[in-house]
Amino acid sequence: EAPAFDKPVVFGHMPTKNFCDFSYGRLVAFPLHDAHRNLFAIDGGNAVSFGGQLNALIFQDGVFTSDWCDDLPSAIVCRPQCESSGWPNSVCWQHNAVQVLAERDGESLCRVLDTGAELFIPHEKLFIQDGKTCAFDFTDYRPPLRIGESVSIVERLGTTCLIKHAGVFGLCATECLQFV
């Protein structure tokens, strides 16, 4: 566990989506602030992680804000989506070993071995490494979306898209999006 610092400490190297325990189980690419330790994680995974972004941390008059950009294709929300209920289940790089519990058309119900989280993961997101079944970054979170909002398209997965909205990764039905 990192110590608490008297002055703000800004660090990178590990993309923020690997800190899903600090973001309520969500995979995020925006900067994270641990106020207790006075730490700022700013690595959005740009050019290292598919769906990453370039983050800027802005300090002004003792207050911090952030901004970011990515080079992903975008879409406009044409049908609203309600936020998924409950704690999101996610798999990320440092906790990528999974156990396949059941299979159905195109996806498997998996348990993330390090966290116990269970979620359906598309078969194309699973791989074998050193004899273990693993998964690329994925989540079952569905962010709240309003008509007219813009989202980044991380990956099209048949009837669903893995998107990024305001720096948060999530799922959205393809039919709810107008691709630009």
Give the positions of each predicted feature.
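Feature recognizes metal-dependent phosphohydrolase scaffolds
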Residues: E1-V180
